[in-house]
Amino acid sequence: MSKINKLEHIRNIGICAHIDAGKTTTTERILYYTGKSHKIGEVHEGGATMDWMEQEQERGITITSAATTCRWQDKIINIIDTPGHVDFTIEVERSLRVLDGAVAVFDGVAGVEPQSETVWRQADKYNVPRMCFVNKMDRMGADFYRCVEMLKDRLGAKPLIIQLPIGIEENFKGIIDLVKMKAVIWKDEALGAEYFEEDIPADMKDKAEEYRAKLLDMVVELDDHVMEKYLLGEEVTAEEIKRLIRKGTISAAFYPVLCGSAFKNKGVQPLLDAVVDFLPSPIDIGIVKGMEVSTGEEKDFPISVTEPFAALAFKIMNDPFVGSLTFIRIYSGKITSGTTVINTVKNKREKIGRMLLMHANNREDVKEASAGDIVALAGLKDTTTGDTLSDIDQQVILERMEFPEPVIELAVEPKSTADQEKMGLALSRLAAEDPSFRVSTDHETGQTVIKGMGELHLEIIIDRMRREFKVEANIGAPQVAYRETITKACEIDYTHKKQSGGAGQFARVKIIFEPLKEVKDLKDEDKNKIFVFESKIIGGAVPKEYIPGVEKGLNNIRETGVIAGYPMIDFKATLVDGAFHDVDSSVLAFEIAAKAAFREGMPKGNPKLLEPIMQVEVITPDEYMGDIIGDLNSRRGQIQSMDPRGNAQVVIANVPLAEMFGYVNTLRSLSQGRAQFSMIFSHYDQVPSQVADIIKAKK
């Protein structure tokens, strides 16, 4: 297959869903039927091929997205298995960044759950075309049609039903393919590897005709010629329907909906056919956004084998056999072992050593990879998540990823002094792998503080530290990661002068600080940032080479805010004026001046304390509803909605994280163990003044 032609045959897809919707099982079945896995791995037995870290095998949840290559028909499918637990949202986010399409798996019983909404919004952010697989059709309470309604109501999505289930719950035995208008039935005794087509059962003919008409109504809108045929009563061929479903999927005009039961081996092969038929190849995506290093110009780069090499590092993993592995998605050009490329973000050269195609935890050495491929590189020295690797002669920086701020932190200390150095090394390795995990030292106590996206996230980090790096540690109680911000604009003019023999220091800066939400002409790319710096210096009042010093100073000092020492977020700093001295000015002098300007200026901006607010979903039998709502209100919660789901009630509330520690035990006693809950970070909000006073006093 020629390299150029090869791009059309690649599908880079993610399989994403809420925890327990059956995502890993679906991926396992895909690997089984595409011939990559000789034993079906069951998650609940701890044997799934994709869940290859020890903790994942024990907990039955997917933590790191393992990238796997398999083949179906004549296509290469690279699958990224993404975690469904809310604490690992960052893994989902960075997987979506490098994918061309996704399969969203939904639980046929629970429908659209909170994490499903989060993943869907993340996929919207990166414009990822996707289709939906309603799984677990064999389970008690499964309801395909209700799930489709939830796609509309909760996600605002436009579902395109291309299959209907035959039978429900334990009688689920197959599907109706609305494109071919045939029934597909699976043989249980062949582990789902054998299936056959037959005529649609008589009792489902009318329903199939009704949904086929709905399907045609939606797809013919994409092509005037086909619409004319349809309106004249002529037959629209299966090939035309497929072409239009593909067109609509790639343009996100609608989302094809399929169904099945991965665990019972039904519906997986048609899902694979749909991945190949409807999800985009790298050619359909066509371009990747980035910046030309030589000119600083933002532009769209074509995805092509013949262009210069450019790739994005989207994941770092420690492999027990190979050491550090950097997963890259190649957007253009090609690369061979032994080549030297440049990391354009760090401006460091990297020599390509071993290149590996990954199959969960098996690996295959390759000598060459090209546009569209996802490969793992061994032994890179300076590359971290979000960096670009590029051709040395034509350097580009691909669009970077934004990572969320951690919401929870705790102190760790090694159990013995001998472990001190090992712990430092372990934590820095783990932080290099995971940008949503941060490590810092508390300046007052000297303690090491780790920060992450939730209790489970930090639990797993500590677990990995113990297993992989053999470091035993004592753990403090979890603390809320508060933040600070300003609520009104303020201006400060500060001069830093130091004259004490020898070289002097001089720098003057005039900076306007303002809350981000009040900035009128904020650029689109700055809207998700927590700190924006801009220089409006004209006429050389501050020479160009000193301006990075101002930004660096502000970036460092904002980590310790002015109220209680928490990081300062959601503000813009604009350098509007300044002065320098020919001899005494330096980058360092401007860095010091910026820090002092921050310390003096920020208190004038009416600073406030912020706390993380979580979206909490509680599913409870009716009879405990009153007690649960009363308890949420007592935790400063704000009820957002209450909806019936089957014979239970679903309560969604926004509650400060500080009030949610130990909630699992309270809920258990309020509902006699019958209610369950999940929570996900929603946003930061101002802390009420009486609560803020208590927090300040503790600091």
UniProtKB/Swiss-Prot annotation:
GTP binds at residues 17-24, 81-85, 135-138. SUPFAM superfamilies: EF-G C-terminal domain-like (SSF54980), P-loop containing nucleoside triphosphate hydrolases (SSF52540), Ribosomal protein S5 domain 2-like (SSF54211), Translation proteins (SSF50447). Residues 8-283 form the tr-type G domain. One of its GO terms (biological process) is ribosome disassembly. The keyword Transferase does not apply. GO terms for cellular component: cytoplasm. It comes from the Bacteria. InterPro entries: EF-G-like_DII (IPR053905), EFG_II (IPR041095), EFG_III (IPR009022), EFG_III/V (IPR035647), EFG_IV (IPR047872), EFG_V (IPR035649), EFG_V-like (IPR000640), G_TR_CS (IPR031157). It is found in: Cytoplasm. It holds the Pfam family EFG_IV. GO terms for molecular function: GTP binding; GTPase activity; translation elongation factor activity. The keyword Magnesium does not apply. Keywords: Cytoplasm, Elongation factor, GTP-binding, Nucleotide-binding, Protein biosynthesis. Belongs to the TRAFAC class translation factor GTPase superfamily. Classic translation factor GTPase family. EF-G/EF-2 subfamily. Catalyzes the GTP-dependent ribosomal translocation step during translation elongation. During this step, the ribosome changes from the pre-translocational (PRE) to the post-translocational (POST) state as the newly formed A-site-bound peptidyl-tRNA and P-site-bound deacylated tRNA move to the P and E sites, respectively. Catalyzes the coordinated movement of the two tRNA molecules, the mRNA and conformational changes in the ribosome. This is Elongation factor G. It comes from Rickettsia montanensis. The lineage of its organism: Bacteria, Pseudomonadati, Pseudomonadota, Alphaproteobacteria, Rickettsiales.
